[in-house]
Amino acid sequence: MPSPKAVERIAIVTHNHEPRVADAVARVERLAEAKGVEVTGEDGRPDLAVTLGGDGSMLRAFHRFLGTDVPVIGVNFGRVGFLTSMVANELETGLERAFVGDVTVVRFPTLDVRIGGQNRPAVNDVFATSSRLGRMVELGYSVGGEDLGVLPCDGVICATPLGSTAYNLSNGGPVLVWGLDAMVITFVAPHSLHVRPLVVPHMRDLCVTNKTPDGSVTVIVDGQEAGRLEPGEPVEVGLGAQTGMLATLPERTFFTRYRKAFAS
């Protein structure tokens, strides 16, 4: 894990315009001024990105700072907040600690999605499903160049460790602990008793081909449509070269979050 350091500059990232979030922005700015920390824009080479919002805001911040070695720490103003490190009433005490480097920084892998001759990064997950609501699709798939067959299903999810606790988990996929350099492949409602999720390491890319004779497949990357596959067209997904960085208070470990969100 990268060694944390004292913070000189921060960027405040929020996509929520509620009054309580606007008030939180002012609180962060006052705290930063009191501690001699400069508040800069997202392009101002910050040492830390402070995100005010939920997991969706965290994902957008991760995308913004991918490959920059800028860690992202979150204050939860959303619902679940699995990726955030503190709630609103902990903002001052938590950020005071972050400003002096009292955080743990976790580096996490991303996905490289290749569709239609273009590459896109995914922080959370990739989902391929029918372009027509409620329709089953037939997907051919291979891992590491080895053909694994054609499967009728409602779709397939490929998730990072960071994204494994989202849609993947809801569909019976395993949770990947932070720190693993792997991705998980989980089918949605497969018409087979023998298909199980797969945990795949680096250099074992997933290739999914639309084998549905009369329908297209929509590919969704981190909740945004990335393209469509006509019959016979593929999408390839593998672990990417870019990494993201999550800053967290040391006691807010992965298993602390897991126990609170899923095991209690």
Predicted regions and their residues:
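Short glycine-rich anion-binding loops that position phosphate/pyrophosphate groups of nucleotides
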Residues: 17, 54-57, 80, 162-164
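Gly/Ser/Thr-rich active-site loops/lids in small-molecule metabolic enzymes
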Residues: 150-194
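Short glycine/serine/threonine-rich phosphate/pyrophosphate-binding segments
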Residues: 56-62, 165-170
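A residue-level signal for conserved active-site and pocket-lining positions in enzyme catalytic cores
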Residues: 15, 50, 76, 126, ...
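Catalytic core of DAGKc-family lipid kinases
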Residues: 80-155
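ATP/NTP phosphate-donor binding region
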Residues: 1-48, 52, 60, 64, ...
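Proline-centered loop/turn at the N-terminus of a beta-strand
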Residues: 69-71
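ATP/nucleoside-binding phosphotransfer catalytic cores, i.e., glycine-rich phosphate-binding loops
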Residues: 120, 128, 133, 144-147, ...
